[in-house]
């Protein structure tokens, strides 16, 4: 266990609600300014109207705000929710959750979809949704422990800055030897110093014995997270089965899950090849349809597209089953093992790069005139480590490059 010293600002102990038909009927409310932790009811009318996920997020965000609130006001909330099917093993895509807030980029509401274990672990710990408001000094970590049935607001100074090192330390510290039971949300120094910050959602890949990541990338929600003084949010849970959600009709759920999984297993190899390639399969398709962003999307295709497409990354991806939730047959998460960055803080060290996804390849590759997969991997790695949205990074740099080419800047 990694030794860390923490000061407890607030603790709430609770009796965990059992999930019934996919719901706990409670949300968790953390106010960082007041240093308070509370729970609130989710009534039947709210469930029928908003269902879960984005709906619950918008309801909780609306309830927290006044009409003139800005993204960096303490009243702005970060809301995270799964849904009634969330956390169902072997049901494709059920590890997903939605993150919602006011965007520092648009000043309007933004939501971002993210995979991993946090959404399910939050629900199984007793809460259909999480709302975080207020602000605090830095180094704040919120811990939701569904096993010990307590929530802590901690001050932990001296934690690593980048998301990779931070998630490793917190997973090690809070896991009590069962790392697969921990999911960490974090941003990074890039999120704290720009308006294009992303959030990293971790899960522990037991087969590969390493912490892995998915990103809530769009809209600058990582910037909101950092502005609140949050270092991380940690969820802890244990075993999950088809019965954990206590579905209304377990046999019907099994039947539908088998049907979906069978179709995916049969059809995916002939169509999208998500389990083998992930979203990388889109590169040649978009190039053929003149839709591959190239040179700030002045063009839609490029002869070098094959250098950053399916053939290139199929050789680089770590082989074997992958995926960011238990038993998901889409299994679209992929990564590159033992990549060695050429630059930066990790120069010369072997790292595992989660991705790249198609949007990263297009945004930080062809859109910048880069047709080298290793350069794209390096950009991908450091954007994630520092909490920067790869799409925003790629499109911003591409815009500046075209401005320079046209003589608008020097």
Question: Which residues are covered by each model-predicted region?
Answer:
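Intrinsically disordered, low-complexity segments enriched in small residues
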Residues: 2-113, 117-410
């Amino acid at each position: 266990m990694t030794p860390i010293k923490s000061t407890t600002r607030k603790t709430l102990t609770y009796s965990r609600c059992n999930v019934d038909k996919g719901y706990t009927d409670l949300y968790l409310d953390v106010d960082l300014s007041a240093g308070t932790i509370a729970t609130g009811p989710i009534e039947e009318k709210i469930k029928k109207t908003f269902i879960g996920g984005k709906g619950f997020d918008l309801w909780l965000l609306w309830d927290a705000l006044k009409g003139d609130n800005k993204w960096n006001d303490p009243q702005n909330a970060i809301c995270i929710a799964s849904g009634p099917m969330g956390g169902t093993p072997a049901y494709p895509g059920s590890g997903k959750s939605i993150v919602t807030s006011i965007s520092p980029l648009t000043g309007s509401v933004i939501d971002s979809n993210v995979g991993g274990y946090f959404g399910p672990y939050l629900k199984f710990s007793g809460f259909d949704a999480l709302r975080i408001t207020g602000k605090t000094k830095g180094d704040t970590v919120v811990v939701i422990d569904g096993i010990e049935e307590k929530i802590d607001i901690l001050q932990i100074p001296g934690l690593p800055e980048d998301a990779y090192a931070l998630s490793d330390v917190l997973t090690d510290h809070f896991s009590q030897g069962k790392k697969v039971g921990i999911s960490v949300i974090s941003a990074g120094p890039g999120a704290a110093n720009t308006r294009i910050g992303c959030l990293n959602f971790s899960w522990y890949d037991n087969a590969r014995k390493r912490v892995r990541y998915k990103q809530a990338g769009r809209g600058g929600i990582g910037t909101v997270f950092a502005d609140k003084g949050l270092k991380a949010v940690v969820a802890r849970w244990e075993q999950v089965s088809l019965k954990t959600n206590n579905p209304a009709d377990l046999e019907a759920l099994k039947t539908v899950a088998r049907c979906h999984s069978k179709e995916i297993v049969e059809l995916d190899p002939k169509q999208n090849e998500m389990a083998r390639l992930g979203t990388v399969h889109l590169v040649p398709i978009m190039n053929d349809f003149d839709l591959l962003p190239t040179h700030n999307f002045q063009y839609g295709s490029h002869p070098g597209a094959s250098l950053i497409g399916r053939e290139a990354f199929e050789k680089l991806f770590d082989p074997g089953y992958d995926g960011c939730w238990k038993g998901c047959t889409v299994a679209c998460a992929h990564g590159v093992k033992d990549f060695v960055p050429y630059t930066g803080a990790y120069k010369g060290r072997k790292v595992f790069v989660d991705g790249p996804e198609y949007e990263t390849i297009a945004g930080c590759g062809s859109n910048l005139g880069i047709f080298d997969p290793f350069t794209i991997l390096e950009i991908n790695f450091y954007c994630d480590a520092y909490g920067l949205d790869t799409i925003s990074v790629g499109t911003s740099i591409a815009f500046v490059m075209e401005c320079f080419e046209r003589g608008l800047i020097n």
